[in-house]
Regions:
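Hydrophobic alpha-helical segments typical of transmembrane helices
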Residues: 38-41, 48, 112, 160-163, ...
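Hydrophobic, regular-secondary-structure patches
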Residues: 1-72, 76-82, 114-115, 165-166, ...
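Peri-transmembrane interface segments
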Residues: 1, 194, 205-241
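Membrane-embedded alpha-helices of multi-pass transport/permease systems
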Residues: 238, 247-248
């Protein structure tokens, strides 16, 4: 439950592809149904969102001088910080102008700083390389540490989504869209509105299934609670069987 709350208040996640097709769950990274035009339509037309950001990522090695570290560069918009409850502690977030120009800039987390700049030097203004592309560090995120599942939330690199799409991946589609509803009570209204806009954009007929998947923070919490309840029941059953087998 704590991990879900750490992801950001009222968060809504939109992924390409149907949740299930022919009884088989699809790999979202292989789907290309979400385009920049979808993000722009949602940004301009929705009434129940406080923030929205595209998401596209590329994995590889980060290099600074003689130091390197495996990481993913996440291409996002400026509102991603609000959605994920992140704060720039040193320097600044990249700008809309950087997004428009596909600027080779990035914002990094503390784990990246510690591994690429172990001498303690200020990374802001320095160049790191990813897939032979130089990225100038413009900001460092405030540390969030590890989440309740033991995942390092500081091993993060953010760059303009246009930079990742054009310079790193050479793709025209998105791997996802993150958004925040204005309030928790408005989440359902927001998802309905998102569904209507995307179905219209994708020219889907009434009989067509959605070619995208929407998940809300509330849904994730419910799923996690259900899984926890199931595991609790399962463990209780196993314990009971053990007692019977042991003759207790």
């Amino acid at each position: 439950q704590q991990q879900i709350s750490e992801m950001g208040s009222n968060m809504i996640m939109i992924h390409p592809g149907a949740d299930m097709r022919g009884g088989v769950r699809q790999d979202p990274s292989a789907m290309q149904t979400l385009k920049l035009a979808d993000y722009e339509a949602l940004r301009d037309e929705t009434n129940f969102l406080s923030a929205i950001s595209p998401n596209v990522s590329s994995s590889g090695q980060l290099i600074a001088g003689n130091n390197n570290y495996p990481a993913s560069v996440n291409g996002v918009g400026t509102e991603y910080l609000d959605i994920r409850q992140l704060t720039v502690e040193n320097g600044e977030m990249f700008t809309e102008a950087d997004i428009q120009s596909s600027a080779k800039v990035c914002v990094i987390g503390k784990t990246i700083v510690d591994n690429l700049f172990p001498d303690g030097s200020d990374p802001v203004g320095k160049i790191i390389r990813f897939s032979k592309i130089p990225l100038r560090v413009v900001g460092v995120l405030k540390s969030k540490g590890y989440n309740s599942m033991g995942q390092d939330q500081d091993a993060v690199v953010l760059a303009p989504y246009t930079t990742v799409m054009k310079r790193l991946l050479a793709v025209t589609y998105l791997q996802g869209v993150f958004a925040s509803a204005l309030t928790e009570d408005m989440t359902d209204y927001a998802t309905e509105e998102i569904t209507e806009i995307l179905r219209r954009n994708h020219k889907l007929k009434a009989s067509d299934d959605d070619d995208f998947t929407i998940r809300t923070q509330q849904e994730l919490s419910t799923m996690l609670n259900s899984t926890t309840d199931l595991m609790t029941t399962l463990l209780a059953c196993i314990a009971g069987i053990s007692l019977v087998v042991g003759g207790i």
